[in-house]
Amino acid sequence: MQVDPTKGIGLANTSLQFSNGRLHALCEYDLPYVVRLSPEDGDISTVGRIENNVSTKSTTAHPKTDPVTGETFSFSYGPIQPYVTYSRYDCDGKKSGPDVPIFSFKEPSFVHDFAITEHYAVFPDIQIVMKPAEIVRGRRMIGPDLEKVPRLGLLPRYATSDSEMRWFDVPGFNMVHVVNAWEEEGGEVVVIVAPNVSPIENAIDRFDLLHVSVEMARIELKSGSVSRTLLSAENLDFGVIHRGYSGRKSRYAYLGVGDPMPKIRGVVKVDFELAGRGECVVARREFGVGCFGGEPFFVPASSKKSGGEEDDGYVVSYLHDEGKGESSFVVMDARSPELEILAEVVLPRRVPYGFHGLFVTEAELLSQQ
């Protein structure tokens, strides 16, 4: 069997996005694939690879949708200049404005995730870099550069070039995933909450030796200074928030507890308002010996527009008990100090450990094109 790489080689196994009546399966070295989830029996079918309305050869597995405007923001990255290209789409999913090549990336970096705020797109430039020449030497193309100083870059959301981009050195801050970002003080301060990966030299080959602590970084736009506050010293990643607060100031996040990563032995709730006062974990659920979960996901009890509290909802996840060989789906009370399990459904077959998840509502299922 011959494979045409121009028709896609991605596994579409990293993340999921529901947008404009379509469920997208994503990975960062290919374009999105549209899949359809049957509302009747849950059967999944592949519709096809998205090739129109996209001018790059790949897209991030972590696009961001602004819950206020409905716009979606994305990017692609690779080992050839421009190393990162930014793009945006209107609320109907149509390409909006030109792609923006970000030439101020000095070398090809591992840019897995990014953030949006009301006025900016926030990009990390971390100590994991790509060195294509290493392939010729029989070595791995991606690896750490311990001499590099990590940076955060702010690009105006509606920029048409990277001439307005500002970079801020943040030594020791290697942001692979983002929890949320927002603006304060009339837009003069940009706040980013994200796990910080260390030691970075173990990020590719030795996940079991990684420790991922959650930090809050504050960028003062007038002075250019950056301050950091540790929110939790625990080994936490795969953080989620109420999606209605994406890009806007939020208070709570729910993160997986590594045992070590990528296995998740429990979920914690972090309160950002406790920043600067020590450990910010305010709720916890441990899954038990030999029981591990996937990325948690927050499901609001009602929409943000209805005026409910930010944490009024549920945290859901798949679990697998390795001792019993049993998989289940659990629903936890997001407001409970113990993240109390309200419901657990034992599943008829194994659900493998994965990367990122998505909760799709009944209304979204029925709206699929």
From Swiss-Prot:
It comes from Crocus sativus. Pfam families: RPE65. It comes from the Eukaryota. Belongs to the carotenoid oxygenase family. Coiled coil: none annotated. One of its GO terms (molecular function) is carotenoid dioxygenase activity. GO terms for cellular component: chloroplast stroma; chromoplast. Binds 1 Fe(2+) ion per subunit. Fe cation binds at H62, H112, H177, H356. This is Zeaxanthin 7,8(7',8')-cleavage dioxygenase, chromoplastic. Cleaves zeaxanthin symmetrically at the 7-8 and 7'-8' double bonds to produce crocetin dialdehyde and hydroxy-beta-cyclocitral, two water-soluble precursors sequestred in vacuoles and involved in the synthesis of saffron pigment and aroma. Its EC number is 1.13.11.84. Induction: By dehydration. Its cofactor is Fe(2+). It is found in: Plastid, Chromoplast. The keyword Iron applies. One of its GO terms (biological process) is carotene catabolic process. In the style branches. It catalyses: all-trans-zeaxanthin + 2 O2 = crocetin dialdehyde + 2 3beta-hydroxy-beta-cyclocitral. The lineage of its organism: Eukaryota, Viridiplantae, Streptophyta, Embryophyta, Tracheophyta. Keywords: Chromoplast, Dioxygenase, Iron, Metal-binding, Oxidoreductase, Plastid, Stress response, Transit peptide. It is an enzyme of class 1 (oxidoreductase).
